[in-house]
């Protein structure tokens, strides 16, 4: 029983049998302290503790002496930790002992103290144990002090770990205001000794402090300082003041070396150094915010390899760089430290790419290694894209149903539901979790084709038919057909993989270049030239191109909720394929074939668009640039030409600069849509896409004898967007309705043109329309509003749903409909009937599809059946791709000095060459649009073939003829070649360089593509779809004589 008149501390002192230290212990410790190099500091700590009088005075000496002499903390701790902080740590430990004594329970040390500028955590240390309390502490520190935690699967943590957590465990990554401007510094130490003789508990101590950086330059703005700091490498300018003062010269030298390297890189810098006998120092530097959960994942990695940390540090720098320094030792002393540390350093790069996923439990339970579990994650995401389909059955039923649109619509809905219900993402994941032994077999197969090590001769030669024995193993192992299909899809991934950066030492995302032979020709009638698959911790995406020389935009796909994310993830490849295929059709007039890239942001990383884009581009460049670490089974040079699309317009400058930094010779042409100062031609500023779309509107009205000013028009895509704003600016019609991101703006009497023109000039949403300028029948319904009463008395329950479906609403009727925005397949078989009036007529007699894939092909055909005139996207909106193609041509034809002088706008001064080049681009766009419009109109008049089909037939014929021309002897005719290239190139470029210099500078495959596309398109537009070989011969003879 405790004496109620004594404090707990006094009680302990009064009962020698329960003391943690005997008098003999104290004497021995005092003798040890005499030779301790930190004796003076210990004396100061004793003085502090005695002055606070929280520990019984007779206990201060042995407690402090044990802490310094027996606990076994690294000397770095005493060098870098202030005496007052050490005193608090000793007091915390003593408090734990008092609680243990008072309760009679086993000594459990779970201590944490926090204030605004620092925090301390002390916990038992059990190296290599998954259930160690230290693991929970590190997760909490990572989330709340580094701002980079993301623990997707809370089942990874035991109830005991959650119970001792110093904070609530959140599965979400920090975003927005939750992310502190700089993470905390961390010093972590593991004791080699125990708490006392009677309690053999080793401890791990975490000490966190806010960094204090040197003051920023006072005469610069905050944004300018941030810009300068991002590239600053001098530790004395960007390091914490205490770090600079107290770190050893060796540490500063190592940190300076990695800092110099990491600032110019996208990914991490990982190095290791020998430390004492059979120890190693692992140093990792990376840009903060570029990954998540990295700190805890690195700990799990070295635990997997039977290593533990004696002490470790996290240092933050004001330029945004974080550096880890981890001192490792093997759990078993006979282990070769060199082999272990090399393996850890090698895999740390892979951990950076995918630190934590739903498959991480397979790694933590040692069922799979980290490379194996990373491979499994990639295969899971890949297989999911190509399993959710019933191609054979669907084709058979669709053929049996025939032209019955209602039944076709029902069949399409049934197929979608069956596919999603059968192969959900979770269903595929569960199969992977159930059969890790199959993943091991498939990974070994993957490794032997793509890991070269030090000898490239070790790798197997590419063989798309390999793996029959693996297929047999799959069928023997799994117990149902669905799982068999899943693992067969993974084997197909292996079989068709031509190159990957998986084994490249530094990378930011995993990228894979695939032969498209794995695609079903029933589902994907046109086979692409190449498919790239890119996976990062914040995203996954594809890049698809239909020709070697191809160009297309990169699209960020965001998801507002889990339902939308499920839809976006299941349709990711199909959306990418359809966009690229449409691009291929519309690119028939230009040198590049069609391509498209998509980046699907992960559900919990919707704010990481820029980080995801950077990694996506870096991953693609890994496979485009020569690298001895990558086994290249394709063995041909490749170039991608990229452009802006949804969510990426602001990133084109960076992508071009990054390609230059990485040594890509094609850097100027790598991206279009760059800023004026970088020689870009912004589509929105010059209305490039709209210029093509509007030619179809004007052409149709001219054929019908209508005056544009007398026609009503409805458009999706508002005055804040590229197409929407320029459609308002260029048109002279009576616009009655606009739908954009803010809501629905409608006035049957016609919207005030001055007012919508004002919004278009300022690029403002429709919600900023002056409502006083609406007629009594006019209204605006905001997406955020509910239960809104319209002028006709109808009640709008949800503004968001009203906006999403307004193009299908009977209130919306006009002579012309120009979709300038909206999601793909907004009109399809399941809802196209809503486009018609009660008498079966189209609510929009004229439709020019400005937005890509707004209608499905079957929906277009049904609309045409009702008598409407519709021109599909591949024909109507090709102005943007024409502009981008000519932007690429200028970048390839001009050398660096010429490009800077003639194409880059500086200080708002537009070079004369640039102004004239824009005029030439406008002329080319309008000419191409008029030629195709006239061809489609003429063919429809003579054959009655639907215009939507004619558009495809034209593209197919031109593209097919282009391919034939490029492989024919026509290319060898020097005179013809010069003549065609002269006709195809902008006049101002010809005047500057001359045709011979253009042909000399531009890569031959690109020149050949210009030659073929120009010849093929001009012939087909002139002679039509039914032209024969004799007509082509006549055409060629005419050209040669001109």
From Swiss-Prot:
Location in the cell reads: Cytoplasm
Q: Per the UniProt annotation, how does pH influence activity? A: Optimum pH is 7.25-7.5.
Gene Ontology terms: biological process? glutamate catabolic process
Q: Which InterPro entries match?
A: Aminoacid_DH-like_N_sf, Glu/Leu/Phe/Val/Trp_DH_C, NAD(P)-bd_dom_sf, NAD-GDH_2nd, NAD-GDH_euk, NAD-GDH_N
Active site per the UniProt annotation: 596
Q: What is its main location?
A: cytoplasm
Per UniProt, activity regulation is:
Activity is stimulated by AMP.
UniProt xrefs under Pfam families = ELFV_dehydrog, GDH2_N, GDH_2nd
Gene3D superfamilies in alphabetical order: NAD(P)-binding Rossmann-like Domain
**Which Enzyme Commission numbers does its entry carry?**
1.4.1.2
- Residues bearing ADP-ribosylarginine? 763
Q: What is the name of the protein in this document?
A: Glutamate dehydrogenase 2
